[in-house]
């Protein structure tokens, strides 16, 4: 799937990137002409601030870009994850004050490998708990909770049902390069790690942002939230290719098949982001 920043977008879609010190010196005057949203790494581990956090933030803070932050985790206990959330929130507070931007918890393969070197095996229970503790700290500081993850980690590490029960206003940021995930009610989709944007030398991660990440003047387009709508209705599949059908309202339940784009189905209930008909599918990709 070939995409470039700066293409035509809808009112509910913003083209964005995420950046860190790995991108080196960025020409933000050029970049800001190509994108509408940016998620910047604030730091990692035990209060290590990203080397480009300050210049990157100062270049975009007062622009029209929709801004978020993320923190790469090296936590191997729940207390460490909570403290990382505090470190991240403090970094954001120092630069954004009380502006309500999201802060994402980023636990990946290197995080798990680091924990293993410390004699700790991070499994589904641990990863889920760490995410909740980090995001709890973020919320305590008044910032929006976001989880960065990929399909493998959703299936094998993060229990999204448990996390969403603990963090109902969770923003989900899903990395799935080359194919669009359908089941996860995501706020941001990272669709490539090899994007090209004027003003950045080398590759950069590319994102599609479906919500207003920052709450400005008390108003934001919310992330998909738990709702219940009863009553049968005809709805059309708006996904670009197909939409998975699940046996239960859970991304880890049995895959019963798929609905091609444009298919019209009769939905009898929408609850917690899932539409029920003969099976279940993500309500995010249905429209009356």
Locate the predicted segments by residue.
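Functionally critical loop-and-helix segments that line ligand-binding/catalytic clefts
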Residues: 3-23, 28-29, 161-227
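Substrate-binding cleft of extracellular glycoside hydrolase catalytic domains
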Residues: 9-135, 139-141
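Hydrophobic anchor at the start of a short beta-strand
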Residues: 67, 144-146, 172
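Aromatic-lined carbohydrate-recognition surfaces of secreted/lumenal glycan-active proteins
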Residues: 138-156
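A short beta-strand micro-motif
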Residues: 233-239
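Short alpha-helix capping/helix-loop boundary micro-motifs
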Residues: 249-254
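SH3/SH3-like beta-barrel superfamily modules
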Residues: 255-288
């Amino acid at each position: 799937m070939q995409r470039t920043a700066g293409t035509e977008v809808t009112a509910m879609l913003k083209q964005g990137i995420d950046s860190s010190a790995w991108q080196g010196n960025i020409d933000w005057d050029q970049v800001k002409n190509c994108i509408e949203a940016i998620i910047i790494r604030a730091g990692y581990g035990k209060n290590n601030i990203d080397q480009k956090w300050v210049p990157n933030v100062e270049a975009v803070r007062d622009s029209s870009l929709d801004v978020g932050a993320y923190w790469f985790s090296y936590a191997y206990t729940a207390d460490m994850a909570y403290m990382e959330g505090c470190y991240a929130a403090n970094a954001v507070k120092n630069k954004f004050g009380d502006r309500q931007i999201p802060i994402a918890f980023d636990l990946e393969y290197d995080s798990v490998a680091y924990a293993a070197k410390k004699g700790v095996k991070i499994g589904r229970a641990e990863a889920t708990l760490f995410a909740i503790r980090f995001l709890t700290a973020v919320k305590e500081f008044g910032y929006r909770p976001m989880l960065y993850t990929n399909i493998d980690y959703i299936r094998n590490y993060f229990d999204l049902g448990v996390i969403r029960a603990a963090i109902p206003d969770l923003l989900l940021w899903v990395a799935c390069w080359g194919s669009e995930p359908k089941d996860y009610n995501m706020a941001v989709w990272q669709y490539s790690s090899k994007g090209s944007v004027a003003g950045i030398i080398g590759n950069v991660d590319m994102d599609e942002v479906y919500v207003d990440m920052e709450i400005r003047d008390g108003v934001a387009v919310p992330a998909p939230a738990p709702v219940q709508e009863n009553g049968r209705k005809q709805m059309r599949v708006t996904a670009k290719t197909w939409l998975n059908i699940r046996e239960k309202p859970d991304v880890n339940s049995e895959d019963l098949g798929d609905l091609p784009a444009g298919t019209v189905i009769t939905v009898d209930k929408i609850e917690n982001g899932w539409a029920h008909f003969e099976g279940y599918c993500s309500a995010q990709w249905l429209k009356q």
